[in-house]
């Protein structure tokens, strides 16, 4: 077991039993160590400037490995909403598969992202990232400051917005597709909706 995995296990404050977390992390480490030719599901070249982004991106990969196949996402109550989201000049976000139960619970848990983001490509969907989302009014009932995850602050999106939703907080994590502008920036210039 690598030092990185041991450190993640030791520092983990998640509610997952350590034995299960050890197995998940060991499997992810094996996949990552195999290199970019081992799978077409993961882009290996992510670049992070500190340990915090790398840790959160790595955790997201571990927790969402099971959702690289979109059928697993739908089986876990994630459903596509809003179609493929694209920006005029910032790239795209992709197709958001949202778990409405997780969205409505008012909680933030790195192991349970509210949305899985897929990029359409040649009639298939490729997992590229996740989005943590919490309704602002629900969050404010029990919290006095905006949400944070592994030291990363969420962005506030007011209402009205392009989605027709009440105000919410959100955090994108581009764990499966490198984003030249940063792992937590909303728009990813490497993601496109053209492959639908």
Each language-model region and where it sits:
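N-terminal secretory signal peptides that target proteins for export/translocation
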Residues: 1-16
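Bacterial Sec-dependent N-terminal signal peptides
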Residues: 30-46
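Bacterial N-terminal signal peptides
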Residues: 20-31
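Primary mode marks residue(s) on the alpha4-beta5-alpha5 output face of response regulator receiver
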Residues: 41-196
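Residues at secondary-structure transition points
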Residues: 29, 33, 97-100
């Amino acid at each position: 077991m690598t030092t990185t995995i041991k450190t993640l296990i030791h520092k983990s404050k998640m509610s997952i039993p350590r034995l299960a977390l050890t197995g998940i992390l060991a499997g992810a480490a094996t996949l990552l160590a195999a290199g970019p030719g081992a799978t077409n599901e993961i882009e290996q070249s992510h670049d992070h400037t500190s340990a915090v982004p790398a840790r959160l991106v790595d955790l997201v990969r571990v927790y969402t490995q099971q959702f690289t196949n979109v059928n697993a996402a739908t089986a876990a109550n994630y459903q596509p909403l809003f179609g493929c989201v694209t920006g005029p000049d910032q790239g795209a976000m992709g197709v958001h598969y949202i778990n409405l139960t997780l969205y409505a619970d008012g909680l933030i848990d790195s192991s349970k992202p509210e949305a899985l983001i897929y990029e359409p490509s040649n009639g298939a969907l490729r997992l590229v990232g996740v989005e943590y989302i919490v309704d602002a009014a629900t969050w404010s009932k029990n919290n006095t400051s905006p949400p944070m995850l592994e030291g990363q602050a969420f962005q506030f999106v007011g209402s009205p917005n392009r989605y027709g939703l009440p105000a919410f907080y959100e955090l994108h994590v581009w764990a499966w597709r490198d984003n030249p502008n940063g792992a937590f920036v909303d728009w990813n210039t490497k993601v496109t909706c053209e492959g639908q």
